[in-house]
Amino acid sequence: MLSRFKCSRLQLQKRAISVTKATTTTASQPKRRRTTTFSDALNKGPSFEDFVSGKAAKFTLDPLQQARSNIEEAKRLPRWLKVPIPKGTNYHKLKKDVRELKLSTVCEEAKCPNISECWGGGDSSKATATIMLLGDTCTRGCRFCSVKTNRAPSKPDPAEPENTAEAISRWGLGYVVLTTVDRDDLADGGAHHLAETVCRIKQKAPKTLVETLSGDFRGDLEMVKVMAQSGLDVYAHNLETVKDLTPHVRDRRATYEQSLSVLNQAKKTVPTLITKTSLMLGLGETDEQVLQTLQDLRAIGCDVVTFGQYMRPTKRHMKVVEYVKPEKFDYWRDKALELGFLYCASGPLVRSSYKAGEAFIENVLRKRANN
């Protein structure tokens, strides 16, 4: 009995020594996270013991995370795209008049970065506003645009043409831009409403030059003729982007060829009419695609083109692929003039109705009128 007890005691001692050795060995080696199927890269990171001991700081950042950080750094807003907060006497006056007359402006609806410069005006330059007609709700949903959308917007305000003309006469502008939301719910796309507004402005302020920035009227060229013959001075319709990106950027009802046909018809209807379009850069377009677009525009006699940086209005809209440097915008301006465009405004903050372009076009139109 005694020998059995000694034997059992000896076995227990051996087991205790074995467990102690195993514990000592395990404690000397920090535990690593067990392999998972989530990502091999994650398993190469520091363990909990590394964080406790302070060794985690020696680990290099996961390459995937490093790549994401680099992308985010590149996406930060460059200094040349930062603008001041809107202010000034003219700015507040225009804003007050717009509210009183129940008008909408694309400057506000589209969150234009130039609103401070255009509305602010100054001693040597008159304030400029782009008035948006046919309401503030569009029937289309382009991926770059922040204007509200609805399949059935409210009916056009019959007093809008008169109110718009009254506002223009109050401001004493030498040049005004009228734009519209797309109204596919209307039989004529709103062409007659816009044409009437142009006529009222010419009656109340005959010296004011009028530019209209309108949609494609679903490709109805008869409505393009109505607009071209309304008495306006500049017919603007935006291509927005190059041909290959159009299906991904614009509403499916807007096509590259359809937009070219609108500009072409306007020029054919009134050959002396200045035609104008605008392109956004930073959407992933190539130089070859931009050059081809310029050549397509010159082939139909388009007179003016503007280039501006695409700015993502909200996180719900398409992302910016690239922030194009100012030097590249200078390159495209020179290229456009080389191809024969009458004028080209090109810069990160330039928009289709940018006032620097309007001042130039105003001078061209007045010289034509005097000759």
Curated annotation (Swiss-Prot):
It is an enzyme of class 2 (transferase). It catalyses: [[Fe-S] cluster scaffold protein carrying a second [4Fe-4S](2+) cluster] + N(6)-octanoyl-L-lysyl-[protein] + 2 oxidized [2Fe-2S]-[ferredoxin] + 2 S-adenosyl-L-methionine + 4 H(+) = [[Fe-S] cluster scaffold protein] + N(6)-[(R)-dihydrolipoyl]-L-lysyl-[protein] + 4 Fe(3+) + 2 hydrogen sulfide + 2 5'-deoxyadenosine + 2 L-methionine + 2 reduced [2Fe-2S]-[ferredoxin]. Gene3D superfamilies: Aldolase class I. This is Lipoyl synthase, mitochondrial. Belongs to the radical SAM superfamily. Lipoyl synthase family. Binds 2 [4Fe-4S] clusters per subunit. One cluster is coordinated with 3 cysteines and an exchangeable S-adenosyl-L-methionine. Its EC number is 2.8.1.8. [4Fe-4S] cluster 1 binds at C107, C112, C118, S353. Residues 1-24 form a transit peptide. Its main location: mitochondrion. GO terms for cellular component: mitochondrion. GO terms for molecular function: 4 iron, 4 sulfur cluster binding; lipoate synthase activity; metal ion binding. Pathway: Protein modification; protein lipoylation via endogenous pathway; protein N(6)-(lipoyl)lysine from octanoyl-[acyl-carrier-protein]: step 2/2. [4Fe-4S] cluster 2 binds at C138, C142, C145.
